[in-house]
């Protein structure tokens, strides 16, 4: 039987700290009314930056966990779905949040299609989900010790 490398708990904790910092910055935007958010053009760029970094962290940790298991994924969305299928995160949570992986791809590869309204709505609807990913990852990491 093949032996897989142990999780790098330090890496996971460092990435979670980064995610938490970015979510904290995003909470400033989520508490603004949309008109106020839209009025200052800098808000869009800052929000996009922090959201991309938070999502990159979520996906990097997911990929790290899966790299220690006999699982193959071909894209970011499969990372989230595989985590659900394996019970690392609840399957319904994975289904609900798989679009965050697609959103990360859109922010990176077709960023010009993302409106200020769309990025604002993501900060309104998904910051708690990003925080929940961190909780699930820490729970899983603790069980692996």
What does each model-found stretch correspond to?
Residues 1-145:
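Solvent-exposed interaction patches of small proteins and small membrane subunits
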